[in-house]
Each structure stands twice: as structure tokens, then as C-alpha cells.
């Protein structure tokens, strides 16, 4: 057997979604297709709203501001429901971030070993890039929030996206130069 076969099969550079697929998880690009009753376009519209929303705001006021500022397309506005948006904005995880340092659509380019990424039992390095929906600095450390629009249960989402969340936690820890133990993650469905 070739002693370097495992290393030779590893990518040198990859997107986070490609690595998640290699780990057997669900790729980020499909996360908003959500299945029963949720289109990819609908998920993308909610994601865009959350990218620009004031976490302390009311949905109607935020929608009006976003329309004035041209932040969303008319097609996206048509897919959004103000009551649902108010319910999202009132979730404890988002309410708790008011006044905190919040980074949205935070891109990263990090280097991990294949072992750290869970891809192979080798210390060969892999560079990968991706984007975190929301990252907030809290008293306990960094909180990573990943948006999903799905009719699946929270437990099912945790199972389906465990490889992605684990990889993103490692990426945040590496990018922010903190211990991975200080990075928490939440899926917001």
C-alpha cells in the first residue's frame, strides 16, 4: 500500500461546504432548500433579512428601512412574512445579542490539519474558506449562529449539520485565535 495515499487524496484548498460533504454532512448550499414547504428562494430571503436586520428592531420597521435602502429585491420582500420575522427577532438567542459585538456574513480563510478537520489521520494541512452567518462576542466567548429554514425538527437539524457546525467552530477558533472550547454554536431555524 502507498504510505502517502491518504495524504494525496486530500485537497490542498477547499470550501467549507466541500469539506462538509466529504465528512458526510449536508452542504451549506442546500441548507435553505429545507424540504416540505420551503423553497431555496424563501430561505435566501430570510437569510438576507437577518443579514441586515437590527436585532432590537421590529420587522415592519426593518422591512421599510431595507426597502428604502435597496437591501433586498422585490422578489425577496414578497417571500417574507412580518409575523414570522417578529417571532425570529424575539428569539432569546437574538435578543441576548443586543448591544454585543456582532459580525455578520463573516468570511474566513483558515488552515487546519486533516486530523483537526476530521478528514484523515494525518497532520497534513488544508486551507479552507467559508462564511459564518452571525458571530457574536459574548461574556462566555464567541457565539456562532447558523441560519436554517427547515420544517425538520431542531434535533434533526443538529444531527444533519453536526459536521458543518464542528468545522465552523474550529474555523472560528482558529480565525479569532481562541480555544475551540470558548466557541458555542446555535442553529436558528
Label each region the model flagged.
Residues 1-189:
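Structural signature of nuclease core domains in nucleic-acid processing machines
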Amino acid at each position: 500500500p502507498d504510505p502517502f495515499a491518504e495524504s494525496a487524496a486530500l485537497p490542498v484548498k477547499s470550501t467549507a461546504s466541500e469539506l462538509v460533504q466529504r465528512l458526510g454532512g449536508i452542504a451549506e448550499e442546500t441548507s435553505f432548500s429545507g424540504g416540505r414547504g420551503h423553497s431555496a428562494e424563501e430561505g435566501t430571503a430570510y437569510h438576507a433579512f437577518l443579514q441586515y436586520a437590527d436585532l432590537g428592531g421590529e420587522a415592519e420597521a426593518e422591512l421599510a428601512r431595507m426597502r428604502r435602502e435597496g437591501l433586498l429585491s422585490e422578489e425577496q420582500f414578497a417571500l417574507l412574512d412580518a409575523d414570522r420575522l417578529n417571532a425570529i427577532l424575539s428569539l432569546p438567542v437574538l435578543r441576548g445579542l443586543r448591544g454585543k459585538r456582532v459580525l455578520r456574513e463573516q468570511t474566513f480563510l483558515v488552515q487546519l490539519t486533516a486530523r483537526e478537520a476530521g478528514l484523515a489521520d494525518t497532520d497534513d494541512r488544508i486551507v479552507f474558506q467559508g462564511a459564518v452567518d452571525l458571530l457574536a462576542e459574548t461574556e462566555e466567548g464567541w457565539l456562532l449562529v447558523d441560519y436554517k429554514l427547515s420544517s425538520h425538527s431542531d434535533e434533526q437539524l443538529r444531527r444533519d449539520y453536526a459536521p458543518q457546525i464542528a468545522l465552523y467552530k474550529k474555523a472560528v477558533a482558529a480565525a479569532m485565535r481562541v480555544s475551540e472550547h470558548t466557541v458555542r454554536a446555535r442553529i436558528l431555524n
